[in-house]
């Protein structure tokens, strides 16, 4: 247990006015603070209703107090909670009283960090707390809860155990190569390591889906001026987010709105019309438009249905055709119908943004093109660092397979060691202080 010598305190409820406000205290001074602010030490895990006092024994509030002795608490340390009236001044008085008695104001995520360091949860579960707080859809919240409950950690720990067990067998073969011991045969080892590789690939696919669920996708709307880009944004968001006129070049800056498709957040980005311009302001808007288009996950190339075909030459050169979706807009001005077709391996949708016709088709296509339809209900939220670690582990396993093929058993054992370390970094078994600081600094103060 990594018990800290300092005692921390923070507001654990939302900042602002509310029916109830909570101040949380954790550390070795909890009992001292309880005696001064309550007049007694509460019985563990029992709720007590009474007066709260400041450092001068003046009554400052009345509410419920809870005490959780170490190690049976969230942080693994003594924890004291004051639940009072949710006014900003009242909460500040409680915090000031705790600080005057030796506590210090907690840093962002410090309660969760202490919980991790004291072995109450692993790094994935700690991150899941933040993900639950910041979840922007029901699906994301449920997935974060699965991570908090240990689903993702169990997958990683099981895989890490398999890698370690295989490495033990391989190293034993090295240590006792001159002995007549019946170790795993070549084909059995190869089968086991390929099973590990397949499992990593499966988890990596699920984690990649979890990234989409957690972070969403950026969808840039591109096209010439007056093609109906802003109308398309308004139709997708079902709001008048963008100004729509018949004057070309109305949109001069980037406008972003968020929608949800299949429980996944999509950031829809309306951009300035792409054309050659001598107007200084419009040129800056086009520059920003190109930046958003280049960095988008999906590009909606909007063109007028009265044109024969879209002018793809106006798009930045380094976008991926697979992320491109052609939107043939204003079909209400032609004899064309709302439909989906594939032209030169690129999906094209005929829509009328003005009358919101074909928008359901577009939302479904956004789900398809982004792979969101394949999201399983059991997916857990993941972070970029998880993907990096899984990919690195997969490379090491691939190297280990190659070393096995040529009989380089010692090098194979080393690659298995690397793979295990990469996997262990996900749950925090192997983590640097800098990584921990980066992760927990994004948390709320009271978590």
UniProtKB/Swiss-Prot annotation:
Q: Which SUPFAM superfamilies match?
A: P-loop containing nucleoside triphosphate hydrolases, TrmE connector domain
Keywords linked to the UniProt accession: Cytoplasm, GTP-binding, Hydrolase, Magnesium, Metal-binding, Nucleotide-binding, Potassium, tRNA processing
Keyword Electron transport present in the record's keywords: the answer is no
Q: Which Pfam family, an example, fits this chain?
A: MMR_HSR1
State how the cofactor is bound: Binds 1 potassium ion per subunit.
Source taxon at top rank = Bacteria
Positions of (6S)-5-formyl-5,6,7,8-tetrahydrofolate binding: 24, 81, 120, 447
EC code(s) of this entry:
3.6.-.-
Q: Where does Mg(2+) bind?
A: 230, 251
A single Gene Ontology MF term assigned here is: GTP binding
Note whether GTP-binding occurs among the keywords: yes
NCBIfam families in the record: mnmE_trmE_thdF (TIGR00450), PRK05291.1-3 (NF003661), small_GTP (TIGR00231)
- Annotated protein name in UniProt: tRNA modification GTPase MnmE
